[in-house]
């Protein structure tokens, strides 16, 4: 049994098996009151300052009950600060958006009847994203990856096709393109002339330049209509491959990429065969005519050799791009697709609850996404999330990876609730995808109200089980901060949705940069192969003799000496980007002791952002010889706090200090690992003990502001503990010499 809900183009599909007997997938949520300082349901709150993972202040102005929308700065109440140095025609200088300052006019009151999406959709609240570029919490990311791999280990991976196309509506063909129509007319005209020449004796015996008329018809047909016929042939081959599952899974990706090159190769081959067969070598011709025919023959051979070289080049680039994307982006794309599926599912009706009411056992759902081109919907695809969970990086096919890249790169994050708004307001734009962080906040508010119980400011595990099966809920909970308490607050859920949006945007930039780098490499190799094809043509025509080649080779050696460093830099840049690849777009790195954010990766250069949004351009040939620290790819990182106490402090108080710090870490286990190392680093002047406290975060330092806020809260807690234990430090008495002057 399958239930499908459609709302203006968005679709969520839930498969329900036919088994009648089932166990209740719901489980009582675990509850730990010490781990959630932000809960709104009477949970005991811990004193330390809670972490803030979204540093900009706009998001935290949202507050309100379930029935009343939070007070938000509507576009009418926002007044842009004047800037004398920025033109209205200037574009953002950073792909992550620039810092924009808004002033909220408190004299304006919000319209309570308008939805959040209506209020946010009118304006873009793009903000500086040095701390938001790659927001995925690494610990959460590792937990999710482990959970996905656990699911993959339970069932054998068959690397099945994970998608199927869904027809939105039957699209009538707009007609044949003018060039294709002209080619068809020429083909039919030549075919008619060929039939006439073969059936009428007078025309059949007629010769032009010593060659029968029908031979000229065949030669002209192969030359002018060869691409048309080979195009039909390639479409037939693709049709046969799509009907065969094994071929579709293994070679369809390369067939689509090589179709044009194979088509040109077959065309030149047919032209060469027709030319050699029609012009009989036994016929006596003048020397001038023979030289002309040889010139045409060797030119066609040179073009055929060039087509082979270009075919090999395209195949090599396709393999390189496929392997590169699988190695570097598979896990991130897999997680991003799952996040989008969660948002789509939670924004729709509780289909799992409805399936249980019928007495059926629900299964994993599907994620639907649409591909657009030039603002028009091209097609819709549906991804089976059960198969996505079972996929392994080592066995994923190139075609499957292409579908996943399309799901992330050519479509944005959208929710079912957004299409409901679109139905109510037809003047809204047709593309209702989340386009900025403020729209992500609005979407989070709508989804939260859709999932949470009435008059509740939190989401429990039972609420999620109304929309997803138990296995999927177990994958979702580790992704959201404070979910281990059993209750997800509005704030933490909003932060997670914003993280999902910024993560998707970062992956999109990474895929676009990879595509750009491959295109630049393609242009470089195309130029080299063009020169090689030209040299082959000259050699075949005896235009370039051995002596001439020696002269040219000596010139090339001199040129190579001049541009040798450039070639070396290009090769090193290629190795750095495609082989080493120490970072992706949005990763926070440390180069030469400076903390930088990767904004753009090119074949020859990488663009970084400093913490003050200053852009830094590094040649990749220089970066290849530098050690680079990558925070995003690092595991949960450690931190330390140094401070001094009096030498006379009793050892018992130092032990109490260690115990109090341990209690603080346990009470904030969502931020810190429970164990802390308190060590005496030095004794200074027999008066001061320098203590070093080593702690470990539950995140890496990708989101540096989050790390700094947690460290600040820890230092403030240590200060309070020192005050409670009356541990202090005073300087030794100092001799002061006073000299009087008359």
Swiss-Prot record:
Keywords in alphabetical order: Cell membrane, Ion channel, Ion transport, Membrane, Phosphoprotein, Transmembrane, Transmembrane helix, Transport
Task: Please state the protein's primary subcellular location.
Answer: membrane
Q: Which GO terms describe its cellular component?
A: plasma membrane
For this chain, one GO molecular function annotation is: mechanosensitive monoatomic ion channel activity
Positions of modified residues (Phosphoserine): 28, 36, 142, 145
Q: Give the signal peptide, or none.
A: none
Query: So which tissues is this one expressed in?
Result: Detected in the epidermis, cortex, and endodermis of the root tip.
TM segments?
A: 180-200, 221-241, 261-281, 292-312, 524-544, 559-579
UniProt cross-references to Pfam families, sorted A to Z: MS_channel_2nd
Write down the InterPro entries for this protein, in alphabetical order: LSM_dom_sf, MscS-like_plants/fungi, MscS_beta-dom_sf, MscS_channel_2nd
Please name the Gene3D superfamilies in this protein's record: 2.30.30.60
Give the bilayer topology: Multi-pass membrane protein
The chain's coiled-coil residues are none
Q: Where is the composition biased (Basic and acidic residues)?
A: 17-26, 105-117
Give the SUPFAM superfamilies listed for this entry: Sm-like ribonucleoproteins (SSF50182)
Q: Which GO terms of type biological process are on file? A: detection of mechanical stimulus
Enumerate the residue ranges of region (Disordered): 1-117
Q: Does the keyword Ion transport apply?
A: yes
Q: Which domain of life is it from?
A: Eukaryota
Summary of the function given for this chain in its UniProt record: Mechanosensitive channel that opens in response to stretch forces in the membrane lipid bilayer.
What family is this protein classified in?
Answer: Belongs to the MscS (TC 1.A.23) family.
Write down the PANTHER family for this protein, in alphabetical order. Answer: MECHANOSENSITIVE ION CHANNEL PROTEIN 5 (PTHR31618), MECHANOSENSITIVE ION CHANNEL PROTEIN 9 (PTHR31618:SF17)
Q: What is this protein called?
A: Mechanosensitive ion channel protein 9
What is the source species? Answer: Arabidopsis thaliana
> Taxonomic lineage of this organism?
Eukaryota, Viridiplantae, Streptophyta, Embryophyta, Tracheophyta
- Gene expressing this chain: MSL9
